[in-house]
């Protein structure tokens, strides 16, 4: 008998050579085998999971969640169920379920034009303004507020890429400033015309090293100011968020100083905080405290997450895996 584990489910053709003790071939045997996916035990031992409730949170504490891709998930056949096994198959019921379980804010990314010349979406939820409006309508029905995250690009932006939207290619800094102010203002009036859902707006996403193709601090701050004006002209009560990618290397300190120097009108300095990349909790606390005490601005974690398993479920290497980012820095 011999055991062999196939790489994936399917039909395999097997050729085996039979040899004598001296290594002489006696014959060859051909056959086929069909490999099936293994049955995976998805049961969770809840007795081993204890999450202590944080007491005395302020009434305005943000319990946020990003559901930017949920509409494309539903369209692709993804099924969510409530605790009673009832299927949730639309974004409105999904938001109501979240509200019933303590979520009070939804974060939604917006890309300028996430489609190619043939109208094919780039993926990632194809998060255009129309998609954000659908999610805003669902939030309104559920009584949830919304943070709109304008990447000011046609697809994902992060510290490594801050691509200029197709329609703005070749623009000067002044032209970009006029364009981003107009785009944000018009988009918000489409997403939430009644002005009762959106209460925070990110002008850019993880903009530590650049924004709309600009890497010079003065130019970036000019664009931040233009985007902020677009927000405040829409609704002066909406809070403007400037978002950097990490609290490490004094990033919040540096950028709060930069924003002060160039007199950018904003309300909150946000940061991403992924424990396996972004340092200790004590450093995060120190960076936030600096923004609050030095510049009298609010600060927040705008993005965070951690892996719920180290298992490989799809054949693609996990970001967090055994021996690589599999423990948090200071959690």
What do these predicted regions represent?
Residues 4-8:
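Residue-level recognition of secondary-structure-to-loop junctions
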Residues 19-24:
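Short, solvent-exposed loop/turn segments at the edges of extracellular beta-sandwich modules
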Residues 61-67, 106-108, 146-150, 199-203, ...:
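Hydrophobic faces of well-ordered beta-strands that scaffold small-molecule active sites
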Residues 29-35:
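C-terminal edge beta-strand
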Residues 233, 239-240, 266-331:
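Substrate-binding and catalytic surfaces of secreted/luminal carbohydrate-active proteins
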Residues 40-134, 138-144, 153-179, 270-273:
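N-terminal substrate-binding region of glycoside hydrolase catalytic domains
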Residues 13-17:
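Extracellular recognition modules
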Residues 121-122, 126-131, 157-259, 264-266, ...:
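Active-site cleft segment of glycoside hydrolase catalytic domains centered on the general acid/base Glu
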């Amino acid at each position: 008998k011999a055991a062999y584990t196939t790489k994936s489910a399917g039909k395999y053709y097997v050729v085996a050579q039979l040899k004598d003790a001296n290594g002489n071939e006696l014959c060859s045997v051909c056959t086929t085998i069909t490999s099936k996916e293994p049955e995976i035990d998805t049961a969770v031992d809840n007795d081993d999971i204890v999450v202590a409730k944080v007491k005395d949170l302020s009434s305005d504490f943000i319990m946020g969640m990003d559901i930017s891709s949920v509409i494309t998930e539903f369209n692709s056949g993804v099924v969510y169920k409530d605790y009673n096994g009832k299927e949730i198959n639309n974004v409105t019921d999904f938001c109501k379920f979240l509200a019933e379980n303590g979520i009070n804010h939804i974060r939604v990314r917006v890309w300028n034009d996430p489609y190619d010349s043939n109208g094919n979406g780039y993926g990632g939820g194809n998060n255009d303004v129309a998609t954000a409006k659908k999610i805003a309508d669902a939030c309104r029905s559920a009584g949830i507020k919304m943070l709109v995250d304008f990447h000011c690009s046609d697809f994902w932006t992060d510290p490594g890429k801050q691509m200029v939207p197709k329609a703005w290619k070749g623009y000067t800094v002044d032209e970009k400033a006029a364009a981003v102010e107009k785009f944000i203002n018009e988009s918000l009036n489409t997403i939430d015309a009644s002005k009762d859902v959106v209460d925070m707006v990110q002008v850019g996403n993880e903009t530590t090293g650049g924004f709309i193709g600009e890497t010079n601090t003065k130019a970036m701050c000019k664009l931040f100011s233009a985007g902020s004006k677009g927000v405040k002209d829409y609704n002066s009560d909406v809070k403007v968020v400037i978002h950097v990618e990490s609290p490490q290397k004094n990033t919040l300190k540096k950028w709060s100083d930069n924003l002060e120097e160039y007199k950018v009108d904003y309300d909150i300095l946000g940061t991403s905080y992924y424990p396996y990349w972004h340092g200790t909790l004590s450093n995060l606390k120190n960076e936030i405290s600096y923004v609050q005490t030095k510049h009298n601005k609010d600060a927040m974690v705008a993005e965070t997450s951690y892996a719920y398993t180290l298992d490989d479920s799809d054949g693609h290497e996990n970001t967090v895996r055994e021996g690589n980012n599999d423990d948090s820095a200071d959690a």
